[in-house]
UniProtKB/Swiss-Prot annotation:
Family: Belongs to the UPF0213 family.
Organism ancestry: Bacteria, Pseudomonadati, Pseudomonadota, Gammaproteobacteria, Pseudomonadales
The protein's name: UPF0213 protein PA3854
CDD domains: GIY-YIG_UPF0213
PROSITE patterns: GIY_YIG
Domain GIY-YIG per the UniProt entry, residue ranges: 13-88
InterPro entries for this protein: GIY-YIG_endonuc, GIY-YIG_endonuc_sf, UPF0213_domain
Pfam families recorded: GIY-YIG
Superkingdom of origin: Bacteria
């Protein structure tokens, strides 16, 4: 095991809460230890059923959390917000990745 891998294992996974914009403009909120990979999964049609009616189009927000529990609590708080309040979270935040863009 490399030093970097050992350090990551000692610290634990970094969890994030993320928002994905669907083709119809709706926002989907979820958590993941790898939001870019999860976005790619949503785009491939193998992610949440939410995207069956309107495909994922852009990863628009990612917020790092200290633990999985913190990410779950933040996800619940964001899901409780109105659409308008969720849109306010995105003001000034650049789109992180759109469908078809290569992984960095």
């Amino acid at each position: 095991m490399s030093e970097a891998t050992a350090a990551t294992a000692a610290i634990g996974k970094c969890w994030s809460v993320y928002l994905v914009r669907a083709e119809n403009g709706a926002l989907y909120c979820g958590i993941s230890d790898d939001p870019l990979r999860r976005f790619d999964t949503h785009c491939s049609g193998k992610g949440a059923r939410f995207f069956h009616s309107s495909p994922a189009r852009a990863l628009v927000y990612v917020e790092a959390c200290a633990s999985k529990g913190d990410a779950l609590r933040r996800e619940r708080a964001i899901k409780a917000l109105s659409k308008r309040a969720k849109e306010r979270l995105l003001v000034g935040v650049p789109v992180l990745r759109e469908v078809g863009e290569p992984a960095i």
